Amino acid sequence: MEPIHNPPPQTCSYSRSSTTYTSFKDASCDTKVIRIIIALFLIVISCGLILCAYTFRDLLDADYLAQEGPQQATKLLQQLDDVLTGPPLPIWDNEHLFQFSCLMQNKHKRVLPIDICNPLTKFNFLECICNCLMTKQSVNVNETDMCELFCPPTCTPENYRRLLCTSSVFPFVMWHDPSADTQEAMLTKMDQTMSSGRVGNSHWVLVIVDIEYRCVTFFDSLCDYVASPQQMREQLEGLAVSLGAIYPKEGGADSDQEELLSPFQVRIGSTVKVQSPGEFTCGAWCCQFLAWYLENPDFDLEEKVPKNPSERRALLADFISTTEQAMSRYSSLSWPTTD
């Protein structure tokens, strides 16, 4: 028998020329143009995705109603324009808040600088504010000994006592991170934020207690980041009652006791967002609000702040540039003296 010769199995093969790749240097002119166009297209898409992620939290916060479609579209376009206009504004943190409050004390005299060594949060701010005002009251009537007086590390007890006696406007800043649900968690988050050097979700808000005006004013540049305006008002009304008892109205012997112990007024400084999306300007806005308040406690924020995002940004940028140099004299964090 003759051996059977089976044909070799057929295999599928592809032309090598169809998978040949050339470097950009050796490619033809048409190929180079196509590759450049593709690269530019991918860059544009990547930038768009980054921008979307950058303002994603603000997009989630927007109220989308069918009947308000055009208004919402205009609002988002304004936010986009605000983010893309000019270089980012500087971030003002606790040391800047202290320096600016010292600048205001030097100008107005009745302002107590902000104690940044005693961090306030939504969990302890009511107690801390009451303690500070009670300390002032006891100092005024000479009930507090120098040894018992708690004062910031960068201020002497004698100087702090004098500042307390001459102050009637007390600004307090509150630090907030929405991910912390207890005081311990908030302080831990604060330490982590300071160590990382990143802002994250942290935010500054301002509380002003004015003894002469008998008013408590709350300001949040994002309007409702810590709590809704109504929720904050309810908390501050409890503080206002306590302050009314600490600092009763002046009256004669025949004055009604209930009237003398009437609560302080409560004001919510902003019911609209003045801080632009994508910017970390809460600290600077707190300082700007304090400056306006000291000029006129009855001022209307919405009359001061432009509705146009670009104009609003320009206003804050001008405020920052005109005050940073003057603030630098307090860069050592030493408290101003009353001498």
Swiss-Prot record:
Taxonomy, superkingdom: Bacteria
Any GO BP annotation: protein deubiquitination
Keywords (A to Z) from UniProt: Hydrolase, Membrane, Protease, Secreted, Thiol protease, Transmembrane, Transmembrane helix, Ubl conjugation pathway, Virulence
EC number(s) stated in the UniProt entry for this protein: 3.4.22.-
GO cellular component: extracellular region; host cell; membrane
Transmembrane segments: 36-56
Enzyme active site: 203, 220, 282
Places the protein is found: Secreted; Host cell; Membrane
Signal sequence residues: none
GO molecular function, one term: deNEDDylase activity
Membrane topology: Single-pass membrane protein
InterPro entries: Papain-like_cys_pep_sf, Peptidase_C48_C
Family, as annotated: Belongs to the peptidase C48 family.
The protein's role, per its UniProt record: Effector proteins function to alter host cell physiology and promote bacterial survival in host tissues. This protease possesses deubiquitinating and deneddylating activities.
The protein's name in its UniProt record: Deubiquitinase and deneddylase Dub2
Originating organism: Chlamydia trachomatis serovar L2b (strain UCH-1/proctitis)
